[in-house]
Amino acid sequence: MLKTAVFTCFLCLSFLAVRAQQAVISGNIADSSEKQNLHLAVISLLRKSDTTIATYTRTNQQGKFVLPKVDTGLYFMLITYPRFADYLEPIEIRGNKDIGTVNMTLKSKLLEEVVIKTGSAIRIKGDTTEFVADSFKVKAGATVEDLLKKLPGFTVNSKGEIVAQGKRVDKVLVDGEEFFGDDPTMATQNISAKAVDRVQVFETKTEQQQLTGMSTGNEGKTVNIKLKEDAKKGAFGKLYAGTDFNKYYDSKLLYNRFVGKKKLSAFGTRTNVNAGSLNWEDRQKLGIENDFEFDELSGYYFSFGGNDDFNDWNLRGLPDAWTAGTLFSNKWNSDKHNVNLSYRFNRLGTTNVGTTMTQNNLPSGLTYSNRYTTKNALNQQHAVNAKYEWKLDSLTSFKIVAVYTGKTSHTIGKNNGEFLNGNRDSVNQSFNNYDNSTERNQIDNQFTYKQLFKKKNRQWQTVLRYGITDDNNSGLTNTRIRFFDSLGVYKNTDTTDQQKSFDGRSTTFGVKSTFTEPLSDRWMLVVDYAYNRNLSRSLRNTYEKGTNGKYEVLISEFSNNFQLDAFSHSGNAILRYNWKKIRFGLGSGVSTVKLGLDDLDNNNHSQFHFLNITPQAQFNYVPKPQTNIGINYRGTTRQPTINQLQPLRDNTDPLNEYKGNPDLKVGFNHGISIFFNQYKVLSQSWLGVNFSYNIQENAITQFNTIDLTTGKRTYYPVNVNGNHSWYLWSNYNKGKGDKKPRYGFGLNGNGNRFINFVNGQKVETNSNAVSLSLNFGIDADDKYDFSINPSVGYNASRSSLATGNNNNYFTYGGQVYAEVELPWKVEINSNVNFDLRQHINAFASNTNLVIWSAGITKKLFKKDAGKISFYANDLLDDNKGFTRTINSTFISDDRFQRISRYFLLKFEWSFNKMPGGEKK
């Protein structure tokens, strides 16, 4: 009896123990990308000891599952679902367990991610396209500029200016920092391609635009060069020198040193064969990066003779350029402090002889004008940039930017011209000599305070800025004009001998505060307020000689002295949505502008008031990885500048006299743009499309009055309706592998309808241009590289003044490049660029260009660190400067000097000293 009781008790305890060692497992199964629950997914438990199935179940319609009566122990959990990658995870069961949500991944997406991690050349994430540098083969000693030429969607011209995905690159960063201020060529033409890890390209946005998520639609592109980690240790640089031992020379020195997070760079160049871009854009606020907020008043301070060859050279004439600079940057205390200091000097001398032939389409018929110019110019610039950032903690930061720019320019030249009637009889002949000097000193300061909050995405930012600009310009002009009657017989001569001076000072102050508030995990509200003020004083006077031979007699009708007080208040409200595959923004801004203009000559006061509305909307959709679609709309007001509003007469060119119009209205522009980007990993193909369309209301154009008896033109600005423009860029590329062909094509176009007035008659011109380009290439590392890029274009222009004239023509262009590696480390290369265009009836001659250049290079030293080469530029001596312009009232061919055939013997040495690496 006792044994029976003990046995019964043992069985009960064993049963309870077994019951205690069983558990219930539950969870939820979902799609990782769509965040949707998966119905009927299979969940299996496999014993770890022998991988046999212990139990299994399926999910219900809500994606939930329960595995009851599971013995404790070690298992593998296997989850399967059609088209999804299997999920296998070890699991230890000790008691009841809820594993939460298991996100399953589509097999197609998983494959893409694996390929991306192991060998993808291109990645698209949001607005950023990233290129893995080592995926694109470049020759030894290549620069970043050479690398960019290999990337899909990039073009680089002879000045070093870059176009990426159809838009001009206006900023190049190195590891997120500017490299010598606002000269992008300093990075692209001097940093070695082998030092680059990745190249990123994205829309250029100010800090305010990054907060709002909205843009103007007219932004350019920013390129960020991310260096390899081993390239940021030690020192590297380049020494380059070339000469023909007679007339031409080209030299460059660059040194970079990294010590921890400290960076020191210095450079110097001297050349008369390629001055590069020097300074791509003389921004109104030089050097304040592209996150500087321009205000509504930027058009209200103007200067006489403000342009210079730093902006206008455009490969016209023969250059003689010097540049030098130094840069220091450092981050310390866990990157809480960041300083960036740089100095840059530019000196550019140019000489140019040019000819411009023009056919004028007037209501009364055709006339002709020819102009012959000679120009010598010397421009110099000193630019100092300083930036300091301080992150007080994870939520608060300050940034101070200070910039000084000093520029001087001296230009001497002469312009001779003639105006002919329809029978090509002389109406006038002009002879002009000028001597102009300009000086500008500019100081700009910006202070930024940024405050984050513990609530995610809540942010407050305030920007203060203060700037002073001083202009001092003077010029002498002597013009002699001979007039003829209708039969071409000489009548009389008119002479102008004047001195023009301009002294101006502008002081600007602005503040802008932006607050971002998350309304939910999907919605966000961004509001901002800005106040800007501009105080300007402009003294612009024209003098003629007195009896003592000095320029001291004031000509009041061509003089103007005024003081401007302009200020604006503006506000914006933007509602943003961001969830899964969709990003959306909608909002509007409103600003009021008041201009107070004091005429110091006549003691008059004028006021102008403008109301500006800027509605905007953006929509972005990511249907799948590596694909991006977007559409943007922005409405902007176009208010007249002071130079357009004030009734000042300008006779700098006596045959083309300008005067202002105080009755101008504010214009409005509707701009819409659409873009599409897609990269397919498996096929290594990339497609990009950008399209934009603009409609202008109350656009400001010109009212021209031409006196056919004298050939003199008087013009002033007026408002018109009906102007519009469009732009298309598209590019497809496939393949980038070693020894594998790469090919692609591009379809581009642009057009506009432009309205102005000539002798009281409204003139409408419709111009459209389309082009198709193909590209094919193949290369093998250190063996050969071949590419051919032909293009064909068609230009059509029709004016209501000359409906019978045919100004349509084809253009043919392209490039053929070949490079072959020979034994003994010898390399030969050949490059042919051609630009051919169809003849039009307006001109007897036509200009077609075929530019053939070639070189032979011998590699030297260890790791091919040195090179000696012989280079021949423009072997056919065919590099003639030429542009053609077709407008509503004229067709013009402009011919100018360019550097043509020359030969250079060049030596190049790239050096580096990296820890643990080899010295070169």
Residues of each region from the PLM?
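Outer membrane beta-barrel strand-and-loop segments of large Gram-negative receptors
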Residues: 372, 508-510, 553-560, 665, ...
